[in-house]
Amino acid sequence: MNTNWILNCPAPKCGKLAEGYYNAGPMLADDRNGTTKEDSKMQLIFDVTKADFNEYVQNLKTLGVEGYLERNLGADNFFAFHYAGKHYHVNYLATRGEMRIIEDAAYVSCKDFGYEAMGTEQTILYQYALYYDPDNNVTDKTVNCGMLYIIKLSDNSLVMMDAGHIRQWNEEAMNGLWQFLHKITNTPQDGIIRIAGWYFTHAHDDHTDGCTKLLHRYHNQIQLERVLFNFPFRGYTGGYSDTVYDMKKAVSTWYPNAKLLKLHTGQKFNLADMTIEVLYTHEDAATKEALGKVSLRDFNCTSSILKATIDGKTVMLLGDTNIETEALLAKYSDKSLWKADMVQLAHHCFNFLDTMYEWIAAPVVIVPNSYGGAHQPENVAKLAGAEKYVQDNQIYYEGSGTYGLIPTPDGWKQVEFYPLVGGEYDFSGF
């Protein structure tokens, strides 16, 4: 193994070190003009075995390093530790014969990020209604994408997932969301809305804009405790939306003490009574031959994939996952990890993901699009890949209204419904 080791943790003494490193990107720093001091870095060692991984972990422990995450996903193994003021995440990927070590410079560990609590409230997942173009088009007043999921946890805090496009948030819609957050948490109008975490699947505007607008309007009445995502380095790839940086600025300006978690495959943590497992990030697509770029043609494949478990029932959160991610996982992932009780249909029903939906085989499907958008002639066959596993007609469209679903011994069940609030964009901005 050569000596081109740039990370600040001890280097493994096995295998071959790939040339260079993969810049996995920062959290809230603006990287439009180049690298930042917050960037996470990953180095890759190949031609290694599980015995090599075990030896490296043991050597770290001999040095007094205390790991805070040690687990496996199928044949893959993960070890996370703190060393010299930074956090490190080690992945051993068995089918590739690789060990990947990621250095996080500016964030908390997944152990310190999460918390466990069992309150008295019924935990409920809402697919929050957004307005979609009725003809599945994109105009100056409408879009055919965007999504927002809200999970009210048992301690009456909220976890938000993505946020919708600015063109889905006219003033009526934004006020409707604000009133909805008060209603489901039974918070008085002059009270504080507690958001335990806001998760963003990837760096597209139809997944971040609504957060920016909500924080601009109501940050004085919102307690935002945590933010979690993994966006790649801007310099490695096209496809970023510039308004994503407005979201970053809003969070850093109004919530400088919010805990930030850079997501990595293998992490597992709790938010109150919900357990989150990270099954994929864009880091998994990096190759030893080309660490200096994102090896994905479609930026949507930088979407992280999470599996959430609440009261024993699971939901697979796919973001805008596309076929490149599916092909990578088909080659390297343990398929048994993917079975779930509910699935968020990927990328607004724009992609064929029949293989992935077969692994998941979810009897409940939540669709981040309208019924009309999902049933456009070009989308019907894409929907069918997930729809074939649906039981009791449990397929819910975000454009039809807000659906509230709870975990029960018999699976996820719809228990609440609220009509769509809002319509075409009114150019009210953030």
Residue ranges and their predicted role:
Residues 1-42:
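Compositionally biased P/S/T/G-rich terminal and signal peptide-adjacent segments
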Residues 47-70:
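Amphipathic alpha-helical segments
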Residues 106-193, 262-339, 407-430:
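Core dinuclear metal-dependent hydrolase active-site scaffold
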Residues 145, 167, 203-209, 233-237, ...:
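Active-site environment of divalent metal-dependent phosphoester hydrolases
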Residues 150, 158-162, 194-201, 225-230, ...:
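Structural recognition of the beta-strand scaffold that forms the well-ordered cores
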Residues 168-229, 332-350, 361-365:
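Active-site metal-binding motif and surrounding structural segment of the metallo-beta-lactamase
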Residues 205-220, 236-247, 355-358, 377-381:
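Metal-dependent catalytic neighborhoods of phosphoester/phosphodiester hydrolases
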Residues 226, 232-285, 297-298, 364-430:
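Binuclear metal-ion centers of metallo-dependent hydrolases, dominated by the metallo-beta-lactamase
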